[in-house]
A protein has these predicted regions:
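Extracellular "leader-to-stem" segments immediately downstream of a signal peptide or signal-anchor
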Residues: 3, 20-25, 31, 38-39, ...
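Cationic, low-complexity basic patches in intrinsically disordered or flexible, solvent-exposed regions
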Residues: 12, 16, 38
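Short, solvent-exposed linear motifs at loop/edge-of-secondary-structure regions
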Residues: 218-233, 266, 272, 318-330, ...
């Protein structure tokens, strides 16, 4: 709707939004309405408001303005799902991950295009589409495309009729600033590690959780903009959290260094926040008029320091509120390009997409925050050795990679740079096709570079978890209620191009290498009967802990700090054939299952974790309830020590298949071992409409 100016006082609210009506399950929320938003001349069609009873009567809270950056909802101080299990110094508020308020369900179509439409026509439709509307591509094949571009164009959805109906076939990519990509969602200016559009010294405000900082300059910074915070790497190892990428460090912390990924050189610790207010202004889009800046979320890490030259940098014209939905992207003829590149963005998304044979990553997220990649299917890359990624995140924060199917890709879930506060959840990974070595089980979830911290992996089913030491150190990663099998359905057998047979090498469930410290491994189901041979020793162990590596004349030695800083609690593995609650003598199985050996790091001088007082665990560390897209008859949670009667064989009944795995096996008719050609996919045939989970109203 178009609001009159000025907006009439007390303009009538519309009926409750069906997509958010399920939120009224919360007992204190009465109704949720779409209310026309007419203030500040922002041109936003509506906001969503929740009403609840308070001591003073009826109160209201703005929940969601689906077009502009979502900065109106306050941050609630509330207990985290992990409270009482993980020490607060070792975890983050992961409920903030993904598009703030959820991906908007846009219904207004600004342009409808038909098969035969050219790249130029699609790009023109995007460029001219009003804020909050949809460019719709009818069913059919759109051939010969050479790069779809959102050049700073926010608030637009490019939507097809379904990934099994609308087919986009690319012959080349488009220059996405410094990269080639078949679809480019990026800021209007070039802001990157080698040439920031704007930069400043970060003068004060470094404490864990702080939301108030000061900068030396705020040129071109606006309320609602993403702000990239960083600092110098650690010059030496003090035996605690260590941020390092330089192979010349003694001893070496990295095999290859990290000078070509998203962070500024030697400034690998990064958090991207959003400006809430600055100086005296707090209206979205207004230019900052003072150097005191309020941010959201607060700082996740406790090691920010004035001694490490902390700094900030930002785009002048970042993009927000744009997304790609419900179509198929065929990259086979577009050699060497990324599939979808998202840069200098906030609150953008990829949903219901099928990607085929990308030149590099199917989706790369760079200098971006609160990006959602969900309900999609990614198949094959052109190079099955290096840069063969499903979803790649670097120099990002608070991204949500959720409920995707990833098949026949060497590195499906690649953290190739900082991703503080990111959530990787409920993805199904099969057949990590890798041609560098025969019979080799390739890792599914890589932490690959320096600066990775405060990640959450939850509910994933995949062959292997891997924290490597190729490009630097990682800290404070949480792994909750996943199944890591320690094997894959099939591995490359040396017969080009796609020959496969049974795997026989690197059959490890979790490989956590040197300088991957302060990890939390909780309630996971690990290993495969008949394959896994040892708990943390032998040829096919459940765990490899703290190991070094050598390559190109560089040796990263084993790290004796990894094991004593590691928290393991409530995990089931097929070698132990029991759940391990190994904290202290009061825990079940202490003398028998645990051998009277604690796996909870209680005695550390920093980042210590007390033994949890209970073996009870929440269903999720980022969701407050079963999500709406989860089938009503499906076990929730699907994986963990408290799960019984699961339908995945050989793991003591502690694991059920997830919706993504069910979609792959039962709807798409995928092979159990992950082999075969690309499959037909439509997210709507597998998943219910998603709704958001919002904080409780204040009491």
């Amino acid at each position: 709707m178009t609001c009159p100016s000025p907006c009439p006082l007390g303009q009538q609210a519309t009926e409750p939004d069906a997509n958010f009506f399920s939120l009224t399950r919360r007992p204190r929320i009465l109704r949720i309405f779409n209310v026309p938003k007419c203030f500040h001349g922002e041109g936003v069609p509506f906001v969503r408001m929740a009403f609840w009873k308070s001591g003073a009567g009826l109160a209201a809270l703005v929940l969601m303005a689906p077009i502009l950056p979502q900065i109106l909802a306050p941050t609630f101080a509330r207990a985290q799902q992990w409270s009482g299990i993980i020490d607060p110094s070792r975890a983050a508020d992961w409920s903030k991950a993904g598009v703030r308020g959820g991906i908007p369900s846009r219904t207004m179509v600004c342009a409808t295009l038909n098969p035969g439409a050219t790249t130029s026509q699609i790009n023109s439709a995007i460029a001219s589409c009003p804020n909050g509307q949809v460019v719709f591509l009818n069913a059919g094949t759109y051939s010969g495309l050479s790069g779809i571009m959102f050049n700073g164009k926010g608030g637009v959805t490019l939507r097809g009729a379904g990934a099994d109906k609308t087919f986009l076939v690319f012959t080349s990519g488009v220059g996405c600033h410094s990269l080639a990509s078949d679809v480019c969602i990026t800021a209007a200016d070039t802001n990157w590690r080698g040439g920031p559009s704007n930069s400043a010294n970060w003068a004060s405000g470094y404490a864990l959780g702080t939301t108030n900082i000061s900068l030396s300059s705020v040129t071109n910074l606006k309320v609602g903009s993403p702000l990239i915070l960083d600092q110098l790497d650690d010059p030496s190892d003090t035996g605690t959290v260590f941020v390092c990428q330089d192979p010349a460090t003694v001893p070496s912390c990295s095999l290859e260094g990290n000078t070509t990924n998203g962070q500024r050189p030697n400034r690998d610790q990064v958090q991207i926040v959003q400006v809430v207010s600055c100086g005296t202004v707090s209206t979205a889009g207004q230019a900052c008029n003072g150097t005191n800046v309020t941010i959201t979320p607060g700082l996740y890490m406790a090691n920010w320091s004035s001694t490490k030259s902390p700094g900030a940098w930002w785009a002048t014209l970042p993009i927000s509120g744009s997304g790609i939905e419900d179509l198929s992207l065929d990259h086979t003829a577009s050699t060497g390009s990324f599939g979808i590149e998202i840069q200098n963005a906030i609150d953008c998304w990829v949903k219901g997409v099928r990607g085929i044979d990308s030149g590099k990553a199917h989706v790369e997220l760079q200098e971006s925050a609160r990006i959602s990649v969900m309900d999609s299917y990614f198949y094959l890359t052109q190079n099955a050795v290096t840069q063969s990624y499903g979803v790649e995140s670097l120099n990002s924060s608070d991204n949500l990679i959720q409920n995707n199917i990833i098949q026949f890709i060497a590195a499906p879930l690649m953290m190739n740079g900082s991703c503080s506060g990111c959530v990787i959840a409920y993805n199904f990974v099969t057949n990590d096709f890798f041609t560098a070595s025969t019979g080799y089980v390739q890792a599914s979830t890589n932490q690959h570079t320096a600066g990775i911290d405060m990640l959450l992996y939850e509910g994933n089913i995949a062959p292997q978890f891997y924290a490597d030491n190729f490009h630097g150190t990682h800290n404070l990663v949480t792994v909750f209620r996943n199944q890591f099998i320690g094997n894959d359905g099939a591995c490359y057998n040396g017969a080009p191009p796609y020959g496969e047979s049974a795997c026989n090498n690197n059959q490890v469930a979790m490989d956590i290498r040197a300088y991957s410290r302060f990890y939390n491994l909780i309630a996971n189901v690990l290993g495969q009967g008949g394959t896994s041979t040892g708990y943390q020793s032998g040829s096919a162990p459940i765990y490899k802990i703290g190991g070094g590596n050598s390559a190109n004349g560089v040796t990263v030695p084993a790290d004796s700090v990894v094991a004593p800083t590691l928290m393991r609690w409530g995990n089931y593995d097929v070698v132990t054939a029991a759940v391990r609650w190994c904290g202290n003598s009061s825990n079940p199985g202490w003398a028998t299952t645990c051998g009277s050996t604690s796996e909870v790091p209680t005695g550390l001088s920093k980042y210590a974790n007390a033994v949890p007082a209970t073996t009870s665990l929440p269903a999720s560390f980022y969701l407050s309830a079963k999500p709406a897209w989860w089938p009503s008859g499906k076990a929730w949670p699907p994986i963990g020590p408290d799960v019984t009667g699961g339908n995945i064989a050989g793991v003591g009944g502690h694991a059920y298949t997830t919706p993504a795995q069910d979609c792959y096996l039962n709807v798409m008719s995928g092979a159990a071992n992950g082999t075969g050609s690309v499959l037909t996919f439509n997210a709507s045939r597998c998943y219910s409409s998603a709704s958001v989970t919002l904080p409780l109203p204040p009491t």
